[in-house]
Amino acid sequence: DEVRPDGKGNWLNLTSNDFEEFIPIATRETKATKSLTRERAVFKIYSQGVKTNRDEWVCDYSQEALLTKTEHLINRYNEEAKRLRNTASRSNVADLVKYDIKWTRKLKNLLVAGEFLKLDQNCARSSLYRPFVSLHTYFAWELNEDWYQLAQLFPHDVMCNPWISFVEGQRLPFTILAGQELPNYAIFSLDPAQFLTLYRFDEDGNRIDNITDWALKQFQQHYQPGRASTGSARKAKAQPITKEA
């Protein structure tokens, strides 16, 4: 047999080079485009998990304990906001506040803007904090440093949204996980995971399939409905492929 190098110039341990022919699971271009004709990935949007920058204050195994300490955090913030009203600015706020609670850039900016906070018990919700570890998280924009795209994936009346996730960084090898609860930013490590949900939601709360029409068409063309399956004595027709299947 004639030996030829693979597409990467390897003569030994030849590799399969069809990876780039696979359908992308998600891309920045598909995420950003407003045109359906330019979508070229399985999922429309994706997001990192909720980044609180104060897990010790807004995450807990007990919902009651969570609300107690979050209420204390809010009360202390409001006391500082009242004390420093018309005094704090972006340049001096870090030197003026008392550090008996966890201050972050967002919370300092809210204080400078004269904003006061109020506890909302509906913000306490179940979340997947680490693989196979669920906690209660206070999911509120003011007390979470970054939501990324989570407002479109987990609006406040949506407790579960099936997702798959993956991560590949400096601290651990390629890892995948599936779940349905609100995910934490550091679910695997400080290398953030990307979460791809089954659904997304518009500003009015309407549920939209997060799997693109383009991807559905690719699968329908490849796995044609009615094609006889193999691998069993009795052949059965394949079921039509839909986004719900």
Predicted segments with their positions:
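Sequence-level detector for compositionally biased, low-complexity segments
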Residues: 1-245
